[in-house]
Amino acid sequence: RSSDLNDLGKKLSEKPAAILASVVCLLVPIQMVSQTWDDHDRSGRYTCRDFGQNYLNSVQDNGKPILFTNGDNDTFPLWYNQDTEGVRTDVRVCNLSYLQTDWYIDQMKRPAYDSPSVPIKWDRIDYVSGHNEAVYVRPEAMETVLNFYKQNPEEARKEFGDNPYELKNILAHWVRAPKDPSLQMIPTDSIVVKLDKEAIKRSGMLAPDSIPEYMHISLKGKSVLYKSELMILEMLANANWERPMYMAITVGPDNHLNLTNNFLQEGLAYRITPFDNVALGRRIDSEKMYDNLMHKFKFGSIDNPDIYLDETVLRMCDTHRRTFVQLATQLIKEGKKDKALKALDYCEKVIPSTTVPHDYVMSSSKEMAEDYIQLGQCQKAEKILNALANNAVEYVTWYLSLNELQFANSYDNCMRYFYILDDVCKTLSEIKDAKTGKVIDSATHYTNKFEQLYKLLEKRANVGSAQ
């Protein structure tokens, strides 16, 4: 009996410990949820859907446009909108990362929703895996080709077409079906495309008064073209500008096929045109872009302070703000100041700094302030510049508080914020007080702050060199 009593006593003494352990274990996930719930709460946030629609609504309303994308964030939200929401099913979204594969080219050659097949006329054997994965660019062959045309003009035209450097002839005679496999190449680094002027006028693109006879595509700096690039050229050769083609602004320059100068921005997409828009002094179709941003774009409730915006969403918010600034700058350049001011004010309304902080680099916020200054809205400019300056001061102050090893590892970042603070101070100094005509107080304040912090930097540098 005594042993039974001892066993009972042990069990009773262990029971509170077990209960306590259970309570502690239950508290751990509760603590985790309470601390991280807001970081994962996506309720009320529609940025993914709306920003995807903004890409789709950046392209022309008619003509069954093709929109080239490259990554995840500029592709899957677009597919979701088309597949689930039924938005802009006339647009063919073409992901360049997949365009290197035969199965995806098969898909592109089939209709989808309200979009006809893309203008790729190659037989499957020409693009099946292992065929035309890459074709070399051989500009050194140009002289030999020209000599062949001089010496044997009829035979040359029969084999390579009237112009061996015209895009259609290069694709047909040099890339797809050369008589000699050793001739499979692109025999020039300067391709031409014969232009149908009437088709261009019908296309809806912003065109100059004088349309040239040819479009020039430079391949300088390229030694090889990969299958996806050949497919872009194939589409360019066959679309005849009546099927609008666009490149999402998030596609990197490496995938631009040296067509960057031919781009004309209309929103979150560049329209591919046959013109050198840099030479024409324009990179934006301001009328189309204004209409898209002001009347078609949605912003997924990012102005709601109760909605959590993570790093990825903030990056896309910065992209949208930057796009507004680019539009406003172009409108100012064109003398359309009323529209420029409306665009900037609307940007501040739908992408407020209370939820999407102004950023010197990512948001083009300094350029936004400069636009406001040009429009005579100095108070609005000062507010933005003060936010940028204050942010830089906080970062520099923090970097200067680090120990020697940490500071040494962070030196470049610290100097970057010194540069930002200095640059913002210069812009603030351009704003004069409306009553006194003198430099505004915030310019003096942040200039003094810069000098104080720079003295601390010099002091730290001297201490470090002495050690």
Give, region by region, the residue ranges found by the protein language model.
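Alpha-helix capping/helix-boundary segments
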Residues: 73-74
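ER/secretory pathway lumenal C-terminal domains and tails of membrane proteins involved
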Residues: 3-64, 79-467
